[in-house]
C-alpha cells in the first residue's frame, strides 16, 4: 500500500522525530511511504486569521502536491481536519471543489489510518511507563477520531494508562488563539498541567504537536518531570 506523508509545519520545523517515527511505523506495517516535496502549509493559520485568499492559494498547492497519492496520512488531527474542510471552502468553485473532495476522501490521521484502513491495533510497541493521554479538540470534536488512539495504546506492552481529569478540556493552544488571547491561553494550559500532575504520570501522550508543544512548554517552565511524547513516537518504541 502506497502512502504519502503529509508532515505538517510543526513536525517539519520543530518535531522532525515525530515525522521519522510516523514513517517507521507505517513502513513496519507494510506501507510504502513517500514525501511529496511540493507540500507546504495546509493554510489553516491564514484561514483562521481571516486571510482567506492567501489560504486558498496554499490549499490549491496542497491539492496539487497530493493529487497522485493513493492515501495521505498525517500525524496531526488538526491538519487532517483542515484537509477534510477543503471541499466546503471551495464550494463556489466546482473544479477545485471536486479536487478538494478527492483529497479529503483519501486523507487520514495516523491512528485512524492504522486502525480503520490497515485494520491493526497492535503494532508491537513496547514502553514501560505510566502515562496519561491528552485528547486534542480538533481531532476528537471535528475529525471524530477518539477511540483509535486508545485502541493502539492499550496494546503497547508495559504501558500503564491512567485517565486524565478533564481530558476533553482544551489545552489553550488553538493555533493563533494562544497568541491573540495569551492570558486566557496561559490560564487554560495551567489547568491542563495541574490535571497532568494529578495523574502522577511519567509520560504525557498526544496526537497533535501543537497541543504537546504548548503543554510540554508549560511543564518545563514549572520544572515538572513529565516526558511529552507524540503517539507516533510511542507506537515506534521498542
From Swiss-Prot:
GO cellular component, one term: cytosol
GO biological process, one term: lactate metabolic process
Family annotation (InterPro entries): Cys_rich_dom (IPR004017), LutA (IPR022822)
GO MF term set: oxidoreductase activity
Function comment: Is involved in L-lactate degradation and allows cells to grow with lactate as the sole carbon source.
Family: Belongs to the LutA/YkgE family.
HAMAP family listed in its UniProt record: LutA (MF_02105)
Protein name: Lactate utilization protein A
Organism name: Bacillus velezensis (strain DSM 23117 / BGSC 10A6 / LMG 26770 / FZB42) (Bacillus amyloliquefaciens subsp. plantarum)
